[in-house]
A protein has these predicted regions:
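Beta1-alpha1 glycine-rich phosphate/pyrophosphate-binding loop at the start
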Residues: 4-6, 11-76, 181-201, 487
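Flexible, glycine-rich terminal cap/loop adjacent to redox cofactors
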Residues: 9-11, 17-35, 40, 47, ...
Length: 585
């Protein structure tokens, strides 16, 4: 099939997005994928999961919910996606690729490739190689696991079966969503999580509220519980926990870990020595560290980099495409949303205390303990250099995620701590200290139950916390648990990314009656004069202004940050376009 400007290995969200964008820029592009074009998200993950959750919320029967799921996923038919790529000018090759040398790939054709019989090996040449092969499930080391009826998350989301008794192993996002799905449709669900709480990578209150909701749906939850042995029984299976508890079920659903899919890619031919389960190291421009040279470049996007979620994969793909096309662009991970689409849903973004607590050495421990634990719920690939679903689970992922964001959050000239500088009091607790130059977090909380919207719906189950950088006066992170939280927390993502001062955010008017009004309570607390107010330090603010002047965005004065006068708002409106010009999602 010859030479191409760009060869993309992997046809999931990241691979398809890169291929389409780069082909639109005039490059000759080949995309290599043996499975479904579009990856797991539209067929076996995000879309079928959300479809079933919505059907459950409407009180639909299981049979009708499965039929709707089939419609949403197109019956696992990717022909429409294939046609879109072809129209975009992308050459799609059904097969698996392996790097044989810098600039060279061999593709073993898979069934369904029309150009030649399956098994045929086709050589390709490239100038730019994009690794976007996603992630794969990791089976936990449980004695007898291979002898019992077990599902992966993907298998559970394409099966027509509704087990009478189901064990879900893993209390991360997918484990919680699947627990709610099957419990809502009548299964007796037991959720097993090795950590002491659900969603261990987020602040404790998020997992506690969600656990209460799942219990009300009928699920039984085992926290701090490690599965040790599985046995087949005449009517199903029995799962034994380390504390001696035994749980009977008809099927086990494994939602306890995934790892980057890098095996068999021939990365050693690029000079890369990748430890199994580890993510690819990349630069801020998503170029694979140590893999380029000799006139070729190697990029990575999506789960292979340890950056989770479909929207994060799409974002990285945009960064890769821009750089391939000559538009130099750095990725900014400071405001990537994380969502759990349960009822109530969980939304988080930026730096949060739960992740900050794990930022010390959890990532290193996770790498050392590869595959030694189970039931941790890290069903998505962990942060760069870590394995999801290990002993520290989502806490390890959160630790690396926080380290990455803390590096981004540091202002110019603040690589070293300022001796003697103390954080102001915080409520209810401050986040990471600044011995390494990272932000000091101040927390403000608001209950959704205090909003008229919640009272109208007779639903007081919800809470949000905002985390502000005490020195710069901008938001650093947020977590919200409540109905459809992702839909009304988007403004927080923008605020973190654009570094909008808290004092300006506190002056924003929210429609009545909405859950968004709860944001006003927390923002006014942060912008007020109490213990939770943020007070920008002169040193940090001067660094912010210097950085903005260098970028030509126009600095804000100290007075402007502390008092949202009209001229401050005017100056900040001038700042926003330049800041947001970096975002091309």
């Amino acid at each position: 099939m010859g030479a191409f400007d760009v060869v993309v290995l992997g046809g999931g969200t990241a691979g398809v997005h890169v291929a389409t964008e780069v082909a639109g820029g005039g490059k000759a592009v080949a995309l290599v994928e043996a499975g479904l074009i579009g990856g797991e998200s539209p067929y076996l993950a995000c879309l079928p999961s959300n479809s079933l959750l919505l059907s459950a919320a409407r009180g639909t029967s299981w049979e009708d919910a499965v039929a709707r799921r089939t419609d949403v996923t197109g019956g696992l038919d990717d022909s429409a996606a294939l046609r879109r790529l072809s129209r975009a000018g992308v050459t799609v090759i059904r097969g698996t690729g392996r790097v044989t040398a810098p600039g060279a790939v061999e593709v073993t054709l898979a069934p369904g490739e029309e150009s030649a019989p399956a098994g045929t090996v086709v050589p390709l040449a490239y100038t730019d190689l994009v690794l976007a092969t996603g992630c794969e499930p990791v089976a936990p080391p449980i004695e007898g696991l291979s002898d019992i009826p077990a599902w992966t998350t993907a298998e559970s989301l394409c099966s027509p079966d509704l087990p009478r008794r189901l064990i879900v192993l893993g209390g991360g996002p997918a484990g919680c969503e699947l627990t709610q799905i099957y419990a809502s449709f009548g299964s007796q669900v037991s959720l097993v999580e090795a950590d002491q709480r659900l969603l261990p990578g987020e602040p404790a209150f998020a997992g506690e509220i969600l656990a209460a909701a799942l219990r009300r749906a009928g699920a039984e939850i085992y926290l701090g519980s490690r599965a040790t042995k599985a046995e087949r029984t005449p009517d199903g299976l029995t799962l034994a926990l380390a504390d001696g508890t035994r749980i009977d079920a008809d099927r086990l659903l494994l939602a306890s870990g995934r790892r980057p899919r890098l095996g068999g890619l021939g990365l050693d031919a690029l000079g890369l020595d990748i430890t199994p389960g580890m993510a690819l190291p990349t630069t801020t421009r998503c170029e694979v560290v140590g893999a380029g040279g000799d006139g070729v470049r190697v990029w990575a996007a999506g789960d292979v980099t340890g950056t989770t979620h479909t929207h994060a994969s799409r974002y990285q793909a945009g960064v890769v495409a821009a750089n391939i096309l000559g538009d130099a662009r750095d990725a900014d991970y400071s405001a990537l949303p994380r969502c759990v689409f349960t009822i109530p849903s969980v939304f988080s973004v930026g730096i949060v205390p739960g992740a900050a607590e794990a930022a010390g050495d959890a990532g290193t421990e996770a790498a050392d303990d590869s595959g030694t634990e189970n039931g941790t719920g890290a069903e998505t690939a962990a942060g760069p250099g870590n394995i999801a679903g290990t002993g520290n689970g989502l806490a390890a992922e959160a630790g690396e995620r926080t380290r990455r964001m803390l590096r981004i959050a540091r202002m110019p000239g603040e690589d070293q701590a300022q001796p003697g500088h103390q954080a102001p009091p915080a409520h209810p607790a401050s986040g990471p200290g600044s011995s390494d130059g990272s932000p000091r977090l101040v927390t403000a909380r608001a209950s959704l139950g205090d909003t008229v919207r919640a009272q109208l719906g007779q639903d007081d189950l919800g809470c949000l916390e905002l985390y502000a950088d005490a020195e710069s006066g901008v938001l650093a992170g947020a977590v919200a648990v409540g109905p459809d939280a992702a839909s009304w927390m988007g403004e927080v993502t923008l605020a973190i990314r654009a570094k909008i001062p808290v004092t300006i955010l506190a002056d924003v008017v929210h429609a009545f009656p909405t859950y968004g009004e709860a944001l006003e309570t927390a923002l006014r607390e942060l912008a007020g004069t109490g213990a939770s107010a943020v007070r920008p330090s002169t040193a940090r603010h001067n660094a912010v202004m210097a950085d903005q002047e260098e970028k030509g965005t126009g600095p804000l004065s100290e007075q402007d940050i502390e008092t949202p006068e009209d001229d401050a708002i005017e100056q900040h409106q001038e700042l926003i376009p330049d800041e947001l010009s970096l975002i091309h999602i």
